[in-house]
């Protein structure tokens, strides 16, 4: 009996440390669904479904940094938007619904970019589609052995789709796995844009210090305003090399340094790799965030950078952000223009979903601790029970426990 009691006393802290759990919590004034274990925490939002927080739990402020963008202004639940009340805060543009609730990682669906016509604007369709501005309701929370899984979903009444996610965090691991379904409620086949928009903000996103690595090949800079574009508009890209707005060679790994500027360039993911990746870190923080996703579902990735160039409400020339936008579509130009573009480098710029069909994709985000002077990422590979990051130049490897099947 004494031996049994001693064993229980020994195991209790181990069992507690190994738990993954779920609870509801306010996050910057928003309704949050929190999944966490002893060392890792993820918060998804009821408004828009955004993943607003992916971070280590630590008493070290630098290690516990949240890489995701949290706006400098107060956001609201976007499905509670009232124009007469909120336009004064978020503008009267088609971006207002998204701006009112925009935080962290959002789903751009069924369009990527602005509405395609004035008719869509009049019908209150805004930037990046309906998915990031509606209510995402919790359905259930499962506790399979060693993990917690949140099921939440949203109805898209204007565009006649349904979206659903299962978000999983396992005990002891700094990995979140997301399964995502889209159901076409219409009887006919339809073209869509389906893009994940992972947005990073201060202090993690800082010009000159925030560094990207990605399994991409070639691309093109968007045709944005040349006065504020930090890169040469329309210029070709061979990753990681680009051209600055004054025609000089520039590395695209670093968040571009020029102030009061922004840029967007699209990249074709390496089609020879079944699993694509990107990673990001700040030179002064011991944290690397990475994403893994099937290349077949996500042939494109865009690097959007904003450095205090947008002076409209609610941005007011104060926003610093870097967004990695991976999915079916290279440029945030709206559904109609992506269909008219058709292909880029021979690869489609949109996809079809059949009438009454339900389709699935999945992606994984992870955190890793990195040492001072970390040189960046040469490669990321998935092995049984772990994700392995190889450092550029040194060949040193960092292993992240991952017992959840990836794709």
Language model regions located:
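N-terminal secretory signal peptides that target proteins for export/translocation
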Residues: 1-2
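Bacterial N-terminal signal peptides
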Residues: 5-14
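Surface-exposed acidic/polar loop and edge beta-strand patches at domain peripheries
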Residues: 19-177, 188-407
């Amino acid at each position: 009996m004494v031996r049994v009691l001693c064993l229980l006393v020994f195991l209790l802290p181990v069992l507690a440390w190994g738990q993954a759990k779920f609870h509801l919590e306010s996050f910057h004034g928003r309704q949050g669904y929190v999944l966490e274990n002893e060392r890792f925490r993820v918060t998804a939002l009821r408004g828009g479904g955004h993943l607003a927080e992916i971070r280590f739990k630590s008493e070290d402020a630098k290690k516990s940094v949240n890489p995701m963008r949290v706006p400098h202004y107060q956001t609201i639940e976007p499905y509670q938007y009232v124009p007469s009340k909120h336009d004064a805060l978020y503008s009267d543009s088609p971006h207002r619904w998204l701006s009112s609730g925009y935080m962290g990682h959002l789903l751009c669906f069924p369009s990527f970019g602005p509405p395609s016509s004035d008719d869509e604007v009049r019908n209150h369709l805004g930037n990046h589609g309906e998915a990031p501005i509606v209510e995402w309701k919790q359905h259930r929370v499962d506790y399979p052995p060693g993990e917690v899984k949140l099921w939440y979903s949203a109805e898209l009444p204007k565009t006649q789709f349904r979206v659903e996610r299962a978000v999983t965090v396992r005990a002891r691991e700094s990995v979140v796995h997301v399964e995502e379904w889209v159901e076409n409620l219409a009887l006919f086949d339809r073209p869509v844009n389906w893009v994940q928009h992972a947005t990073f903000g201060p202090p993690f996103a800082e010009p000159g210090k925030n560094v990207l690595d990605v399994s991409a090949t070639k691309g093109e800079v968007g045709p944005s305003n040349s006065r504020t574009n930090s890169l040469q508009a329309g210029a070709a890209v061979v990753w990681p090399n680009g051209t600055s707005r004054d025609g000089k060679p520039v590395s695209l790994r670093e968040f571009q340094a020029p102030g009061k500027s922004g840029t967007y360039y699209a990249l074709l993911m390496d089609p020879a790799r079944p699993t694509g990746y990107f990673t990001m870190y700040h030179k002064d923080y011991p944290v690397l965030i990475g994403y893994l996703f099937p290349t077949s579902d996500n042939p494109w990735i865009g690097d959007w950078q904003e450095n205090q160039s947008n002076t409209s409400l609610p941005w007011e020339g104060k926003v610093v952000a870097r967004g990695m936008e991976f999915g079916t579509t290279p440029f945030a130009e709206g559904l109609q223009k992506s269909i008219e573009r058709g292909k880029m480098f021979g690869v489609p710029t949109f996809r079809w979903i059949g009438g009454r069909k339900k389709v699935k994709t999945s992606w994984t985000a992870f955190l890793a601790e990195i040492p001072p002077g970390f040189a960046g990422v040469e490669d990321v590979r998935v092995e049984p029970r772990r994700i392995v990051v190889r450092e550029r130049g040194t060949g040193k490897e960092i292993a992240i426990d991952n017992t959840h099947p990836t794709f």
